[in-house]
Design a protein with these regions (language model features):
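C-terminal domain-boundary segment and adjacent tail
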Residues: 113, 178-223
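Active-site beta-loop-alpha junctions enriched in small/polar residues
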Residues: 9-15, 91-93, 118-120, 129-136, ...
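Aromatic-lined glycan-binding groove of carbohydrate-active enzymes
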Residues: 151-174, 207-209
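Catalytic domains of cell-wall/extracellular-matrix polysaccharide-remodeling enzymes
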Residues: 63-130, 136, 147, 154-157
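Active-site gating loops and adjacent loop-to-helix segments of metal-dependent hydrolytic enzymes
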Residues: 17-58, 180
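Acidic (Asp/Glu)-rich catalytic clusters
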Residues: 1-5, 26-29, 78-79, 154-157
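Structural preference for beta-strand elements that scaffold enzyme active sites
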Residues: 3-9, 85-89, 112-114, 161-165, ...
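Histidine/acidic-residue-rich catalytic or RNA/ligand-binding cores of hydrolases
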Residues: 16-22, 99, 125, 173-180, ...
């Protein structure tokens, strides 16, 4: 639907590249499959963090290849959806090079970069402290996302707008091959559709909104 803000996560850690693997050889393995975030973090020395960005001793993402793949993913989105994404968003593992590539592509296509838009709008993230990487399946099974989410809301500092990132979905054999974030997706979906969460939001006068509403009133694009 035109009024649903469907954006794109620039994915550099799972599945196959949109680009010809020969042109993004540093991003994929010998089978053309993206190198996982767990493998990147295991094989490269982390020296710090800056917000959502992970700082490595040497950035594992070649900038030019990352830029090519980022733009090709946006092109594929447009091809499939018939419109530009409502926003660009980093996925799983963000570094200086992945962020720089996203900034360039976002500017080229006149699409907001989610984290920049949220920062400029003074939006605060609802802290999610229960999803370590890697995330053992047994721990995922025992995680009560609904309870944790409501507690996170209760403990947040006052703000006009907050946002929460979750991965509502289902689990199948293909997913198990692609990510360590598996069973928790079912828990995320349970949380997002929970009557308990709905009742908490209503009771505390918390309204649901859209990233589109944070955009400039002068933006003529309808997402």
């Amino acid at each position: 639907k035109r009024n649903v803000a469907v954006g794109i996560d620039i994915n550099l850690v799972a599945g196959f590249s949109v680009s010809d693997p020969k042109n993004v050889s540093s991003l994929v393995n010998s089978c053309g499959h993206m190198v996982s975030s767990v493998e990147r973090m295991r094989e490269n020395k982390i020296i710090g963090r800056d917000g959502m960005l992970i700082q490595f001793e040497k950035d594992p993402y070649d900038f030019e290849q990352t830029l090519l793949e980022t733009e090709n993913q946006v092109k594929r989105f447009i091809e499939l959806m018939g419109r530009k994404p409502a926003y660009l968003h980093g996925h799983s593992l963000m570094t200086e090079n992945t962020n720089k590539a996203a900034q360039i592509v976002a500017k080229k296509y006149n699409v907001p970069l989610s984290f920049e838009l949220l920062k400029l709008s003074g939006v605060k993230i609802v802290p999610c402290t229960w999803t370590p990487k890697p995330f053992p399946i047994e721990d995922q099974k025992n995680t009560d996302v609904t309870h944790n989410f409501i507690n996170a809301l209760k403990n947040m500092d006052a703000c006009d707008v907050g946002y929460f990132i979750c991965h509502c979905g289902y689990v199948d054999a293909d997913l198990l091959k692609e990510t360590t974030y598996t069973l928790i997706r079912c828990k995320d979906l349970e949380c997002a559709t929970s009557n308990e969460v709905h009742d908490y939001l209503v009771k505390n006068n918390i309204e649901l909104t859209s990233i589109s509403k944070l955009m400039s009133k002068g933006n003529s694009n309808e997402y």
